[in-house]
Structure formats: structure tokens, C-alpha cells
């Protein structure tokens, strides 16, 4: 669903094979009432969350943008801007009956951002034709002289290593494009 590039700082999935991991009983800063079955594993910037027998692998991709975080958030949070910076997701975005739809290379999906907020949270949800909902964590973080956009690519069930890497590379390309658009 995304296209490819190399300018984003990536802490990508290590090559297939053995992975050295350490496990903590709960995530840093977890609240006391968090379910005990939640476990986090950290390895080379990659997270694996075990939750009730299900495992989700994540790859955090970031791009530094020389623009204030509120400007980056304002631009990136408008679904109509997606084709300009995230054509890997889709080149056509349409609003219908208060909902946003994007035509991906494989199908038309419903797209929704988390409610507007002052924290830079740009999490979004893609609802596939099958009814499956894909949660995509994304943040715009302010720093001293600009911002950093962090996008979490999550491995979906059945996704091969090559597909997972291609998805991450495509996100990196889109974040690099977002940087170019906003720094022009």
C-alpha cells in the first residue's frame, strides 16, 4: 500500500534469523491496572507486543522536518493532502457522507484520523472491504527547531519479511516526500 525511499531514519527489521530480545513485564510508564498478559519486547528499535496469545511486530520510522510541529500536524492531518505526500497509500482521496475514502493500489478503503488534538497524535484507521480495521500509529513530535514525524508500521498476520520491509520502505518514502513538501 505504500511506495519506497531511503532518506528517513529507520530502525528497521533486522535480517531474518536470530533476534536478541529482552522482555519487560510491562511497558515503561504503564499504569498499575494494565492487564498482566501484556508484554513488550524491544530489539533494535523494533517492538513486539504479546497480547493474549497474539503477536504484533512494529517498525518505527521517523523523519525530521524543519517546520514547527503544529504546521506539520495541520498539513498532514488533512486527508485531502494525502495524495501530495503519501501516494503510496493512494492517489485518489474522496469525502462522502462525512467519511474519507482512499483508492489504494488494491482496493478502496475508508480512512479516519484520530480526533484533532494538541498532542500531535495522527493515528489513523483504515477499514478494508473485508471489514478488517488496520490501526496505524503516527505522531508529530516537536523539537527545538522543528519536528519529527514517527510512523509505526505494524506487521499484519501473514505478511512476509519482504512485504513488511517493502511496507516500511514505502512509508519512509512517503515521510521523505512529506518533508520535501513542507520544507519547500
Put a short name on every predicted segment.
Residues 71-76, 82, 100, 113, ...:
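Hydrophobic pocket/interface hotspot
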Residues 69, 114-118, 140-148:
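A short, structured loop/turn motif at beta-sheet edges
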Amino acid at each position: 500500500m505504500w511506495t519506497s525511499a531511503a532518506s528517513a531514519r529507520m530502525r528497521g527489521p533486522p535480517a531474518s534469523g536470530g533476534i536478541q530480545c529482552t522482555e519487560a513485564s510491562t511497558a515503561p510508564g504503564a499504569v498499575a491496572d494494565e492487564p498482566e498478559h501484556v508484554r513488550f519486547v524491544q530489539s533494535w528499535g523494533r517492538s513486539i507486543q504479546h497480547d493474549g496469545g497474539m503477536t504484533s511486530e512494529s517498525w518505527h520510522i521517523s523523519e525530521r522536518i524543519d517546520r514547527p510541529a503544529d504546521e506539520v500536524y495541520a498539513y498532514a492531518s488533512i486527508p485531502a493532502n494525502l495524495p501530495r505526500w503519501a501516494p503510496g497509500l493512494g492517489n485518489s482521496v474522496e469525502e462522502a457522507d462525512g467519511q474519507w475514502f482512499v483508492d489504494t493500489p488494491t482496493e478502496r478503503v475508508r480512512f479516519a484520523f484520530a480526533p484533532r488534538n494538541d498532542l500531535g497524535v495522527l493515528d489513523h484507521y483504515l477499514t478494508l472491504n473485508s471489514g478488517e480495521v488496520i490501526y496505524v500509529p503516527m505522531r508529530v513530535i516537536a523539537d527545538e527547531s522543528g519536528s519529527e514525524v514517527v510512523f509505526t508500521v505494524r506487521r499484519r498476520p501473514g505478511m512476509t519479511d519482504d512485504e513488511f520491509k517493502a511496507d516500511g520502505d514505502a512509508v519512509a518514502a512517503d515521510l521523505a516526500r512529506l518533508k520535501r513538501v513542507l520544507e519547500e
